[in-house]
A protein has these predicted regions:
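Transmembrane helix-bundle core of multi-pass membrane transporters
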Residues: 7-12, 83, 91-151
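Transmembrane alpha-helical segments in multi-pass inner-membrane proteins
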Residues: 191, 195-242
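Helix-loop-helix "hairpin" substructures at the membrane interface of multi-pass membrane proteins
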Residues: 128-203
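Short loop segments and helix-boundary regions at transmembrane helix junctions
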Residues: 29-112, 208-220, 237-240
Length: 244
């Protein structure tokens, strides 16, 4: 196991696990507290539409997926808050529309679509130094905003109505956090895949809630769980010679 640490791709994977653990701990705790876990699946599948458009137009699929994810997430937030549309209904529309657009454009793309399997099932060993720097910049921005607006985020997540009566701009907080959720989904999806992403953003928080009740403690414990499971899974993939 020590020998594999000398390889750059394995070092990159370890850095990726650390960054994923940090971002998913904050994002996951927020969406679980708001009881909006379903939106993660909606954004994930909406970004699939962006992938299809990106492959069809010959542009960076990650960039097009990011645009789709952010617009879809903000659209869900706007529809559910500003209009008489239930949040779960808006998410279902985004979910179905994103998948439909993705399938159509991928089918229309001539030739083979390289890298599509990575987005569906993930491959953390393919992350590059550039990806790590981008992810690290996003994680730093997320941590900075969370520390700066910690109480505001907690009040909004657990009781938005009470927070509104206290003069907190809950809609602005929701929009900003929704932006972070969408960006985190797109940055993580190529590393762990659509299938595993929802689990990373929910299961550690559910386990942490069994032992903690404060938002801050749930973030720390869920991050530690993600980190240990990620390193453990990567180690097992090496020992058993199976996909990471």
């Amino acid at each position: 196991m020590i020998d594999i640490l000398n390889y750059t791709f394995f070092q990159n994977a370890l850095w990726a696990i650390l960054l994923i653990s940090i971002t998913s701990a904050i994002i996951g705790t927020y969406i679980v507290a708001r009881r909006m876990l379903f939106i993660t699946g909606g954004i994930t599948h909406a970004s699939f539409g962006g992938l299809g458009v990106g492959y069809y137009l010959g542009i960076n699929p990650t960039l097009s997926a990011l645009v789709f994810a952010i617009l879809s997430a903000l659209g869900v937030e706007w529809l559910s808050r500003g209009k008489s549309v239930r949040e779960d209904s808006a998410i279902a529309v985004v979910w179905a529309l994103g998948m439909a657009i993705g399938i159509i454009f991928i089918f229309m793309t001539p030739g083979y679509t390289p890298g599509l399997t990575e987005f569906l099932f993930g491959n953390i060993l393919t992350i590059t130094r550039t990806d790590i720097f981008i992810f690290a910049a996003f994680a730093a921005l997320l941590i900075f905003y969370t520390v700066l607006q910690y109480k505001t985020i907690v009040y909004t997540a657990f009781d938005a109505d009470f927070a509104h009566t206290r003069g907190i701009k809950t809609r602005l907080v929701n929009y900003i956090m929704t932006f972070f959720v969408a960006t985190a989904v797109v940055l993580t999806i190529r590393l762990v895949g659509i299938m595993l992403l929802i689990s990373i953003l929910s299961l550690p928080q559910m386990i942490a809630e069994l032992f903690c009740h404060k938002f801050r403690n749930i973030v720390w414990l869920s991050g530690a769980i993600n980190l240990l499971c990620g390193i453990g899974g990567l180690s097992l993939s090496y020992w058993l010679d199976v996909p990471a």
